[in-house]
Amino acid sequence: RKMLEQETFNQQMRIVCNGPKTEKYINLIDELQHKGLKVIPIIEGPTELKSFQYSRFDVGIRLDMPVKSKSSWNKPIDRFGFSRDELLKMTPFKNLRVLHYRIGSKYEKPSDILASTKYALNVFFKLKEKNHTLDTLDIGGGMPVPYERIRKYPVDKILEKIFELLKNESEKHGVSHPNLICEWGRFMVAPAQITIYKIIDTKKIVQKGVDAKKWYVIDGSFMNDLIDTWAIGQKWAVAPANNRFDDKLTEAWISGSSCDSDDIYTGVDGVVQLPDYDFDQNDPLHIVFFDTGAYQDALASHHCMLSSPLKIIAENGHIVVARKRESSEDVGKSFGW
């Protein structure tokens, strides 16, 4: 809303609203739709169905995809969406535009993408028999980022196969080719940022039975700056940042500046290959972590643009508000909006 008021928003963009929707959120969607914005709420469950099924504006609905993939965060039970049978039993919508689903994150096999797309297309064609406005398939996110600099399969080839599948299945059913939405945010924005640290101390590892020979201590914290390192064991490509590529290499572990023993990074194969360096204040070593633009310090506690909660202090029978819950304006300012 603020971006619209400031005339900094492209009104030709389509906004897809995923996730749970409070009454306040639903009212905002309605307000923006009445102002002419192309806002499409994705119906995630029965409560939202009551609010949007007969809307005169475009809506989408989520399929609870039974085709599973080998990927991160692939859950056997998904709390979002409706099964195929539930969708096909629904009375027709007034303006159903989008069928949405997702199968996981950072999926590993192209065949999983195609299998889920084919299943979703069959549901799409069945739904379209009663909902003639349906024209878009949203295959969600999950395209993996080659964090380790190993490109497992080219994205253009995957897209070619998806387009070929959409074309062939559509023509087989005598239906116009659907529009395609991909929510590959991580894949798009991760390469847009690198994170550089200065080595502020080194320490030899004298214990036997480990491959690493040195600790390198950085002037930052993985738990603050690259939180996926600690939270999900994310691996990164790491290199010296200040032209020390001719130096002899050593096997290192990298430690953050916090006092937490979990604030470490031990590399893809158990070590990080870095220039063999002993701390020298007059000859600093800087190292760079690549592809850090998705979900790290850029989002931190604002994943999915959620605001930080109200903070209160309860002491001796008194309750004091230490910090109010962040407003949408506060969150926007964090991103320079």
PLM regions: where:
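Active-site-proximal beta-alpha core segment in soluble small-molecule metabolic enzymes
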Residues: 1-136, 143-145, 165
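Generic beta-strand/beta-sheet core signal
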Residues: 18, 44, 62, 102, ...
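Short glycine-/acidic-enriched loop or helix-start segments at secondary-structure transitions
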Residues: 26-27, 52-53, 148-149, 191-192, ...
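C-terminal extensions
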Residues: 131-146, 287-298
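Charged (often Lys/Glu-rich) extended helix/loop segments that serve as interaction or gating elements
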Residues: 171, 175-337
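Acidic/histidine-enriched ion/cofactor-binding microenvironments in catalytic or ligand-binding pockets
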Residues: 54-57, 125, 131-135, 157-160, ...
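Short glycine/threonine-rich loop-to-helix capping motif typified by GTGT followed
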Residues: 109-115, 146-158, 189-201, 268-269
